[in-house]
Design a protein with these regions (language model features):
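Hydrophobic alpha-helical segments, chiefly the membrane-spanning helices
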Residues: 1-329
Length: 329
């Protein structure tokens, strides 16, 4: 598509791009500050808050888009979108997070969630060998999501009892403070979503103006767009020295992508979800390899180390090279 850019159109595009950038920066600040307050006020570790509350908020836009697409009968690419998002979240965003800041936390906080994520990808790999994901298989994958929620609730109670901080060490929890932080959380999440959409739409327009091919725009903007909320949260968390919140958000968002959004699409559509040849041969295996490369060292060593960031970033680059070379994506 070729757009006729006039001076006023260019100014408007640049203005909206700048507004989008401001929205995601300030929204990210509010969002991470509020999430940190929730963790400190409740006594629940930031990793668990990141893996549940923050992940739910950052995946909500993708969930709504997927559900509405399924209601319109257009959920055929749900598996490709979910798997691609998980691979990008891990190979790009967790890579960035770990390279900038190693993450240390008790193994008990992330071990079960890491195993659930790897199990979800492995189960998906097995279920889709016949080129589709059936309704029954979708229900079975939803069971993994139920296990994730149950484990998160148990972990939250356990950590509260283990930490048992002094009451005066916690931030204020009066009505006004609670309302303020809930407002910051909701406003921050909404600003991130709005800002992401403005950046993608106007970034696409700018790319078209300078002659970038539509195929490249589509591939890059879709990939960036699905992971931008997690990326904004990660960058903000790094700036605020909250690495466990970032890693928790990525792991939680990945689990929700695979075990909630994708099965919901199949159930709403009312028929099996097709899996393309590239998905069976490359995308799902690559997703498993990249996630295993990120999580298994942490399970063994009890820490998300910086070298793991470089390692999974390298795996992601290899995946992209194979994809463009063998499948012409």
């Amino acid at each position: 598509m070729n757009l006729d850019f006039t001076g006023s159109t260019l100014f408007l595009v640049l203005l909206m791009f700048a507004v989008g950038l401001i929205c995601i920066i300030k929204g990210g600040d509010f969002f991470v500050d509020a999430a940190t307050w929730i963790a400190e006020a409740s006594g629940i570790p930031k990793f668990i808050i990141g893996a549940t509350v923050v992940s739910f908020a950052t995946t909500m836009p993708e969930m709504l888009v997927s559900v509405f697409s399924a209601l319109e009968g257009n959920a055929d690419i749900a598996i490709g979108n979910a798997v691609g998002s998980v691979t990008a979240n891990t190979g790009l965003i967790m890579c960035l997070s770990l390279i900038c800041m190693e993450c240390t936390m008790p193994r008990r906080q992330y071990a079960v969630k890491a195993v659930l994520l790897l199990a979800a990808i492995a189960v998906l790999f097995g279920f889709t060998r016949d080129g589709q994901l059936s309704i029954l298989e979708s229900v079975l994958i939803l069971v993994i999501f139920a296990c994730f929620i149950a484990e998160s609730l148990v972990a939250a109670r356990r950590e509260q009892s283990l930490e048992a901080p002094e009451q005066d060490a916690r931030p204020k929890t009066d009505g006004r403070t609670v309302a303020l932080n809930i407002g910051k959380f909701v406003f921050g999440a909404a600003a991130i979503v709005l800002g992401a959409q403005l950046l993608i739409d106007n970034g696409t327009a700018l790319a078209q103006m300078i002659g970038v091919p539509d195929a490249i725009i589509g591939a890059t903007m879709i990939a960036i767009g699905t992971s931008l909320p997690e990326l904004v949260t990660t960058i903000t968390a790094i700036r605020k020295k909250q690495s466990s919140l970032s890693v928790g958000n990525i792991i939680g968002a990945n689990i929700m992508d695979l075990t909630l959004i994708m099965p919901l699409c199949a159930l709403i559509l009312g028929k099996p979800l097709p899996v393309e040849r590239q998905g069976m041969l490359l995308d799902i295996p690559a997703c498993l390899v990249v996630c295993a490369g990120a999580l298994i060292p942490a399970l063994v060593q009890g820490k998300f180390k910086r070298w793991v960031g470089f390692f999974i970033g390298g795996l992601y680059i290899v995946y992209l090279v194979i994809m463009f070379t063998c499948f012409g994506a």
